[in-house]
Amino acid sequence: MFFPNARPVNYPGHIPLSPLQRMFLVAGSAIMGLKAPWRGDMIAVLGDASGQPFFLRRLRDKMLANETGRRILKEQPRMTSKSLNLPHLRTLPPNTLGRIYVDWIDKEHVTPDSRAPTRYVDDPEEAYVMQRYRECHDFFHAVSQMPTNIEGELAIKWLEFINMGLPVGALSALFGPLRLNRVQASRFRRTYVPWAIRNGLKAELLVNVYWEKELENDVDEVRQHIRLQQAPALSPNTP
């Protein structure tokens, strides 16, 4: 059966899909995401549709094998402007993770409230894993000090793919560079792909980091603890 209402709804907002519907949704969202990489809604749909049944389950199992990962899955925290208490983060010392994070989102004009909810993942726990991955994304940027321009987003997608193995990261990492000009593509291959691969392989599984518990810690100590290096400088306006 190919109709969504023929399948059970497993959590609020869940949209169940048949295998055929999932296949078309992956193809359509991948095409739209590559044509318009700023369409966060399409990237979110692609992540939902392509992550199951294998990739999200494997990522969840890795979280279950880790003490902090198990705690995150049990408590299922959400990252919002309210839960992170952004006004408080702006009062923290300059080199704390929380201050680095809030300064980064202010500079890049983004908000933790903009992440689309998971809809197309059937298992509720796996749906939370996808949501957690999505909501942690800005912390990867902030700790790495990568802007939200095309090169910065692609570098983080490479990092996410190598570290967590989700297909949405692989598709963005492999095909996204086609949108770079010759100078950008050369710089990206020489500098940011090696950085992403090196750090993706050696870093802690990034969804196993309880970012909310690290906000008042020195960001350099956090980087050392999770084994994630700051990226080579890339200006938001780099041509």
Swiss-Prot record:
Its cofactor is Zn(2+). The keyword Metal-binding applies. Its EC number is 4.1.1.130. Zn(2+) binds at H137, D138, H141, E153. It catalyses: 4-hydroxy-3-methoxy-5-(all-trans-decaprenyl)benzoate + H(+) = 2-methoxy-6-(all-trans-decaprenyl)phenol + CO2. Its main location: mitochondrion. This is Ubiquinone biosynthesis protein coq4, mitochondrial. One of its GO terms (biological process) is ubiquinone biosynthetic process. Pathway: Cofactor biosynthesis; ubiquinone biosynthesis. The keyword rRNA-binding does not apply. It is found in: Mitochondrion inner membrane.
